[in-house]
Design a protein with these regions (language model features):
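Conserved catalytic cores of soluble enzyme domains
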Residues: 162-281
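Short cysteine-rich clusters marking metal-coordination/redox-active sites
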Residues: 27-30, 46-49
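Long, charge-rich boundary regions
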Residues: 55-132
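Cys/His-rich microdomains that often coordinate metals
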Residues: 33-34, 52-53
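Residues immediately within or flanking Cys/His clusters that coordinate Zn2+
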Residues: 24, 43
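N-terminal alpha-helical interaction blocks
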Residues: 1-15
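Cleft-lining beta-strand/loop regions that shape enzyme active-site pockets
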Residues: 106-188, 195
Length: 281
């Protein structure tokens, strides 16, 4: 029998302290908790494992273009609930919810600006808005951006991230695949460059249209890129899928992606490509 007994230490009663929202982020790559400020300063790349997290469209544009040169276009376009879609929440309610959380009216920010001295038309998709699905507004804004680049005879840059076509708009969303692709075909006929940047994830209707039509296709490291998901493909083909299937690295090895570029080096790489295109025109 013990002579001395160590008293049990009990935690002080009270409510569990909660970490204020938006102060820290848990990295999907390594599981480490990273301060939000540190992530923002590092272009949303995890400083622990180099995982490329989703980057808001405005932040992406600021990291690519020369300071104070971006001019936004078609900022007032917004989607309409033409199908009067009903579900757990109406389409109108969902649009309102994502507008409040992101400050955007839809899933893409478009405009024109200067990148290292080169005039460009640019469209950047924001996965934070309804998984950056492509509806009538997204397709229209991207098409207008391409047409602006064609008219102004400058390069077009599209940074894609998407879960595909927007089911809330039915056939109207699928029509955007043909519309954006047609605009790019006319842009190409004018011998003008189009650079496509694929980020995590880029899938379905977006990948099956404008995202895969770049003169140069760049992907961020370890991005998921494909049409249907691995589970759907496996169930359809009844075959085991290759290791690293639908990753940027796998697609680069098989010639579907031209290069993989770290986010911090993306501006310099695009500038190099633009200088090449300018020299060959």
């Amino acid at each position: 029998m013990a002579i001395f007994k160590k008293p049990a230490i009990k935690a002080a009663a009270g409510k569990k302290r909660e970490i204020p929202r938006g102060v820290f982020q848990k990295c999907p790559g390594c599981g480490q908790v990273v301060p939000e400020m540190e992530l923002g300063q590092n272009q949303r790349v995890c400083p622990r494992c180099d995982y490329h997290q989703g980057q808001p469209a405005i932040e992406r544009i600021q990291s690519l273009l020369d300071p104070d040169t971006f001019v936004e276009m078609d900022a007032d376009l917004r989607s309409v609930d033409v199908l009067r879609f009903q579900g757990m929440a109406t389409y109108t309610d969902r649009l309102k919810k994502y507008h409040e959380s992101t400050g955007l009216l839809d899933a893409v920010v478009t405009g024109h600006g200067i990148l290292d001295g080169y005039k460009v038309a640019i469209a950047v998709m924001d996965f934070g808005f309804l998984a950056a699905t492509m509806g009538s507004v997204v397709g229209e804004k991207i098409t207008r951006t391409i047409e602006y680049g064609t008219t102004q005879r400058c390069a077009v840059i599209i940074v894609a991230a998407s879960g595909g076509a927007r089911l809330y708009e039915g056939m109207l969303s699928l029509m955007q695949m043909a519309k954006t692709s047609g605009a790019l075909a006319r842009h190409g006929e004018e011998k003008l460059p189009y650079i496509s940047v694929l980020t995590n994830p880029t899938t379905a209707g977006v990948m099956a249209s404008f995202a895969s039509l770049g003169d140069v296709i760049i992907a961020e490291p370890k991005s998921m890129i494909g049409f249907a998901g691995p589970r759907v493909i496996k169930e359809t083909t009844h075959q085991d899928l290759p290791e690293r299937f639908q990753t940027a690295e796998f697609l680069e090895e098989h010639g579907l992606v031209d290069m993989i570029v770290h986010r911090k080096k993306l501006r310099d790489e695009i500038s190099r490509l633009l200088s090449y295109f300018a020299a060959t025109r």
